[in-house]
Curated annotation (Swiss-Prot):
This is one of the proteins that bind and probably mediate the attachment of the 5S RNA into the large ribosomal subunit, where it forms part of the central protuberance. One of its GO terms (cellular component) is cytosolic large ribosomal subunit. Belongs to the universal ribosomal protein uL18 family. Keywords: Ribonucleoprotein, Ribosomal protein, RNA-binding, rRNA-binding. This is Large ribosomal subunit protein uL18. It comes from the Bacteria. Part of the 50S ribosomal subunit; part of the 5S rRNA/L5/L18/L25 subcomplex. Contacts the 5S and 23S rRNAs. It holds the Pfam family Ribosomal_L18p.
Amino acid sequence: MIFSNKNKIISRIRRSMKTRCKIKKLGAIRLVVHRTSRHMYAQIISSKEAKVLVFASTLERKINCSLKYTGNKEAAAKIGKIIAERALSKGISHVSFDRSGFKYHGRVQVLAESAREVGLKF
């Protein structure tokens, strides 16, 4: 069986929809992670209103200037720390982790672990 890139994307989207439906049923605030080959994005979204409460990305000038390359584990760790600090400053301490269908491996795992180190619980 040969998988094309299109099939991988469709499978990832299908996995992400299943997890989002489960998280929405719980009514929990969720930490959504998205990654591309060059950048990492993390958002904390309220489940009821679907509004972004906290956002951090490697596209931000302060973060981008302090990193040599924005698509590696070092950048993911920095995003994890920043998103956790911003969430804790707004009074958000417990979230559900939404990995958007990506494997819990590599940059996604590093982002989650660095957010936990700062004090975000999920």
